[in-house]
């Protein structure tokens, strides 16, 4: 509801409540799949701007949003960070390494394909939420710097939904809203 309110309603200026509700309903199966997975402690705001250097050591900051989430949450948050573009080769290498190093008891997936499917769902949810956050910041602070991140995030979503027949309806609604508004 947050992203639909700030991105669709306030940023795009669309007041059609039925359309907003249908967009939320498109995300319901994704959220249901994610919420049925094994949960672990997650940072929930794990991106490049929250990783700092102190001397020769990395420090992670901004823990106030820590909650339970699936193991892919922080991974998708970092690798699909809207503040920088990690190339696909490195993204895939890091996903594969994460899957192989994390004990199966923690991630709970039977194979890498299942891990990837949940990663994709997490990417969609996390990046869509980021779109809402950028729209919120723009709306309340009038900070134009965040407008470029909305576009960057929408392109990430478009790539993630490419060749995904199960997401055709969501893709059509979301991108008709964004690119035709």
Predicted segments — roles?
Residues 1-43, 52-55, 59, 148:
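ATP-dependent phospho-/nucleotidyl transfer catalytic cores
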Residues 2-11, 71-108, 121-141, 153-160:
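Active-site activation/catalytic loop segments of kinase-like enzymes and analogous catalytic loops
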Residues 38, 43, 67-68, 116-124:
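Secondary-structure capping and boundary motifs in well-ordered enzyme cores
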Residues 46:
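Hydrophobic HxD+1 residue recognition
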Residues 54, 58, 66-68, 84:
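Activation segment
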Residues 62:
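Conserved active-site aspartate in kinases
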Residues 108-117:
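Histidine/acidic-rich helix-loop-helix segments that form or flank divalent-metal centers
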Residues 132-181:
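ATP/Mg2+ or Mg2+-diphosphate-binding catalytic cores
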């Amino acid at each position: 509801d947050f992203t639909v309110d700030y991105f669709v309603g306030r940023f795009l200026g669309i007041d059609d409540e039925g359309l907003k509700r249908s967009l939320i309903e498109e995300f319901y199966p994704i959220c249901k799949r994610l919420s049925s997975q094994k949960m672990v402690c997650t940072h929930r705001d794990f991106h490049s701007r929250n990783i700092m250097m102190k001397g020769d050591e990395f420090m992670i900051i901004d823990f106030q949003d820590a909650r339970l989430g699936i193991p892919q949450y922080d991974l998708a948050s970092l690798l699909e960070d809207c503040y920088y573009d990690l190339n696909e080769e490195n993204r895939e290498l890091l996903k594969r390494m994460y899957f192989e190093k994390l004990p199966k008891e923690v991630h709970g997936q039977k194979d890498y394909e299942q891990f990837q499917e949940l990663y994709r769902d997490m990417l969609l949810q996390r990046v869509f939420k980021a779109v809402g956050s950028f729209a919120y910041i723009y709306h309340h602070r009038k900070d134009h710097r965040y407008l470029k991140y909305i576009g960057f995030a929408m392109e990430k979503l478009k790539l993630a939904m490419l060749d995904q027949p199960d997401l055709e309806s969501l893709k059509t609604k979301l991108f008709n809203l964004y690119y035709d508004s």
